[in-house]
């Protein structure tokens, strides 16, 4: 993390270090003058400030940084030497170095970089959907074994999210993005050089495991940068990017596989693409985690003032094992006891299953029209058109939520987030019935392809609304809620990728798609139930926001 510290230290070059030095000297002089008697006025006044750190929000940093005595191991009010330590905080509510106070262009750039990482990684999840079948033929195994290449990627994605989401709260977002991305690049070499189908399956697992960081840390990055109103549009942009990757992947993979390059170039193209992304991340993407930035600030002040007493409390709480254990136990507890988490995880699982079943089902449906692998990828882009149409309505959703937010005098009501899902919940079963009963060879291929527009529209609104609602409902536990949601949706998606081909072969295209549509119909009431009774459900929950 030293290169991050160097960049961050440069940002702090404008600080009035003399003020920090003066503060250190003044407190030391007062302490020598007054002694260590905790009953003296100086200590009583300092304890009063410590107990109400927000009482001096209007002052500059030399008066707002709380002077606290701390034990490096026990967090008592005095350490073994009797010396005080000074906790580093943001200078005020408008500190320009705090991520929420950054210029809007910088926030948008950071969001776009995070979204681009998501496109690169998620494209890898589906780029091999055609190549897996051809590799299976080359290695003389069945097509279902070839589907394992996609399934193990998704299972690795699910497993990695459990590990890397809590680590981003310990070490910051940027180290996780940069380290996992470079490992992801290295494992592409293994995929391209695989000598048998089983080594390919294993490497695909590690592609997913180290590629999960964008989806694992996305909620944290967006929460770091944007207030609740701005988060409405930011999350829609990121969710659109999360779907663009899986939809663009089959187009790329189809044409690469059909060309003279062959299926191995799926991995070489990914390696080049992800490698360039890693360079962009390392040299242009800023750290957004507030506590990590305050750690850097404390480190910078210790170096520049030659005073080792500046600290941030987060520095002494870096316990990755505890963070992972807490995320696991909290996530399991939320999934087992919270109706909100159960319902919206079920919805997220359903759309992820649909997305990756489409990667198997669309080729089966459109091959009967004489499409080749590249043209089947283009057929899937109908879903992308729907996602972009849904994204184009972001200003309307933003205005709606802002009005509701202002009507409540700035108090967040999570149920206000559910408005887009009133439409999205109907779009998905309509699109599936449309696809299922127009995919006859006697019907023009454009008819089933157009159904993808409504499917994509529904995908976007379900993902964005579910994530927003979970964040607003669980606040401090939002990271755990999103972590368990990410795990369940990708684990289920990986399992269903294996059964999709037998399902379509045994039920035929029409009834297999209709079966999914009936499941979608069963999920339609969820947003309406929580819109009318969500507040009552939250008030009965020991973990959810009660407002």
Curated annotation (Swiss-Prot):
Claim: DNA damage is one of the keywords in the record: no
Location(s) in or outside the cell: Membrane
Compositional bias per record (Basic and acidic residues), positions renumbered to this chain: 38-50
Keyword Repressor included in the entry's annotation: no
Principal subcellular localization: membrane
TM regions (residue ranges): 108-128, 148-168, 174-194, 197-217, 233-253, 265-285, 346-366, 377-397, 418-438, 445-465, 478-500, 514-534
Entry's family note: Belongs to the major facilitator superfamily. CAR1 family.
Protein name, UniProt field: Uncharacterized transporter C794.04c
Organism: Schizosaccharomyces pombe (strain 972 / ATCC 24843) (Fission yeast)
């Amino acid at each position: 993390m030293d290169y991050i510290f160097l960049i961050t230290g440069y940002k702090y070059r404008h600080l009035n270090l003399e003020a920090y030095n003066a503060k250190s000297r003044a407190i030391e002089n007062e302490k020598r003058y007054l002694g260590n008697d905790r009953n003296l006025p100086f200590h009583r006044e300092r304890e009063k400030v410590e107990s109400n750190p927000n009482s001096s929000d209007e002052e500059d940093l030399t008066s707002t940084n709380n002077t606290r005595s701390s034990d490096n191991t026990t967090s008592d009010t005095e350490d073994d030497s009797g010396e005080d330590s000074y906790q580093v905080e943001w200078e005020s509510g408008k500190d320009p170095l705090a991520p929420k106070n950054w210029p809007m262009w910088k926030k948008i750039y950071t969001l776009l970089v995070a979204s681009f990482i998501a496109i690169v990684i998620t494209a890898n999840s589906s780029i091999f959907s055609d190549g897996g079948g051809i590799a299976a033929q080359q290695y003389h195994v069945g097509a279902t074994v070839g589907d394992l290449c996609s399934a193990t990627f998704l299972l690795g994605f699910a497993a990695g999210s459990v590990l890397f989401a809590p680590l981003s709260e310990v070490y910051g977002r940027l180290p996780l993005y940069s380290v996992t991305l470079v490992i992801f690049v290295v494992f592409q070499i293994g995929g391209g050089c695989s000598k048998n189908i089983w080594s390919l399956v294993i490497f695909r697992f590690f592609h997913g495991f180290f590629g999960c960081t964008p989806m694992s840390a996305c909620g944290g990055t967006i929460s770091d940068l944007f207030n609740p109103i701005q988060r409405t549009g930011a999350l829609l942009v990121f969710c659109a990017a999360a779907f663009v990757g899986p939809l663009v992947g089959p187009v790329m993979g189809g044409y690469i596989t059909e060309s003279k390059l062959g299926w191995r170039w799926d991995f070489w193209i990914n390696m080049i693409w992800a490698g360039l992304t890693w360079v962009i991340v390392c040299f242009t993407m800023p750290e957004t985690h507030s506590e990590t930035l305050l750690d850097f600030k404390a480190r910078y002040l210790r170096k520049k003032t030659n005073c080792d007493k500046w600290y941030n409390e987060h520095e002494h709480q870096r316990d990755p094992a505890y963070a992972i254990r807490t995320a696991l136990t909290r996530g399991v507890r939320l999934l087992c006891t919270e109706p909100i988490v159960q319902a919206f995880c079920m919805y997220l699982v359903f759309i992820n299953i649909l997305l990756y079943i489409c990667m198997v089902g669309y080729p089966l449906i459109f091959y009967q029209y004489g499409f080749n692998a590249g043209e089947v990828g283009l057929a899937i882009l109908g879903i992308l058109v729907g996602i972009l149409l849904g994204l184009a309505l972001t200003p309307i959703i933003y205005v709606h939520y802002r009005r509701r937010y202002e009507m409540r005098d700035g108090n967040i009501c999570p149920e206000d987030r559910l408005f887009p899902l009133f439409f999205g919940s109907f779009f998905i079963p309509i699109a599936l019935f449309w696809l299922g009963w127009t995919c006859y060879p006697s019907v023009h291929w454009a008819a089933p392809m157009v159904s993808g527009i409504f499917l994509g529209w529904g995908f976007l609104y379900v993902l964005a609304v579910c994530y927003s609602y979970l964040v607003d409902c669980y606040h401090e536990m939002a990271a755990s809620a999103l972590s368990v949601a990410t795990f369940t949706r990708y684990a289920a998606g990986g399992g269903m990728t294996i059964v999709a081909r037998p399902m379509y072969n045994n039920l035929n295209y029409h009834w297999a798609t209709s079966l999914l549509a009936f499941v979608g119909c069963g999920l339609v009431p969820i947003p309406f139930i929580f819109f009318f009774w969500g507040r009552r459900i939250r008030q009965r929950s020991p973990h959810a926001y009660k407002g």
